[in-house]
Amino acid sequence: MGLEKKSALLEDLIEKCGGCAVVDGGFATQLEIHGAAINDPLWSAVSLIKDPELIKRVHMEYLEAGADVVVTSSYQATIPGFLSRGLSMEESESLLQKSVKLAVEARDRFWDKVSKTSGHSYNRALVAASIGSYGAYLADGSEYSGSYGEDVSLDKLKDFHRRRIQVLVEASPDLLAFETIPNKLEAQACVELLEEENVQIPAWICFTSVDGENAPSGESFQECLETLNKSNNICAVGINCAPPQFMDNLIRKFSKLTQKAIVVYPNSGEVWDGKAKKWLPSQCFGDAEFEMFATKWRDLGAKLIGGCCRTTPSTIKAISRDLKRR
């Protein structure tokens, strides 16, 4: 299936959902709720090694909550990260592919069950392969600063992402999801890689924001979106892992800057200290607030809405209930 037909899958899903589809929620934090120990440089990806069945269980929980798109557990799954744990190249690549296979297996099992039930309100979900930023691999909080240092060039970022993208594409997800991109340079690297590798799977690119106005690097989103807007490989652009209170302004901003579908999946409002590796006391929003937010974000122009860190299947159920209330 070529890029055009794959892109149509997302467009058709959004249409079936009444104009706005539901993305799943926080994955790593849901693993923690089930007792997984993920205080590790690999973060949620460590469960690909230790407990793949738990990963499938979390996917199922989000599907049952009403997610139309499930995102794989590969956000912090990188070949250099696996190699540093003593795994071979073959084992590292196999784990990356496993992240997609687990999500696909969960999606297919869930759909096989509910599609036989009359009157259900579910859609056959799409699987998006998560690709975390270079800063996520560094695990030093730089995905929230955009400061990679002068020695990190466009070519270095492409070299970092290339093999991971190749391996994930070989596993045949429906979408690629580049997440918490902090600067224009990495966004450009991702777009150029998709073209260089002739990737026939549509992708979204999500930035994050620490001020509600710009990318973490300080670059304007107008600058960041220039390359993305010209790419046929990019089906959607947006924001993830930023506070919910930033979304109204950012959706309005993106609506003026792009014709691409807009995707937003904020965190719960809590703030992660990437250096101290802990959540800081801050305003936290619950399911009732997210239910209200979802209506507003849809009305402002978002086409895909979900949750990131510290959101749960309960959050996604509230969002789904609201958006699918015709």
Swiss-Prot record:
User: Would I find Kinase among this entry's keywords?
Assistant: no
Explain what induces or represses this protein's expression. Not induced by selenate or selenite. Up-regulated by sulfate. Not affected by the status of methionine, s-methylmethionine or homocysteine, or by cadmium.
**Cofactor names:** Zn(2+)
- InterPro entries in the record, alphabetically? Betaine-hCys_S-MeTrfase_BHMT, HCY_dom, HCY_dom_sf, Hcy_S-methyltransferase
Tissue expression from the record: Expressed in roots, young leaves, florets and flowers. Not detected in old leaves.
Annotated GO biological processes are: methionine biosynthetic process; methylation; S-methylmethionine cycle
This protein's name: Homocysteine S-methyltransferase 1
What lineage is on file? Eukaryota, Viridiplantae, Streptophyta, Embryophyta, Tracheophyta
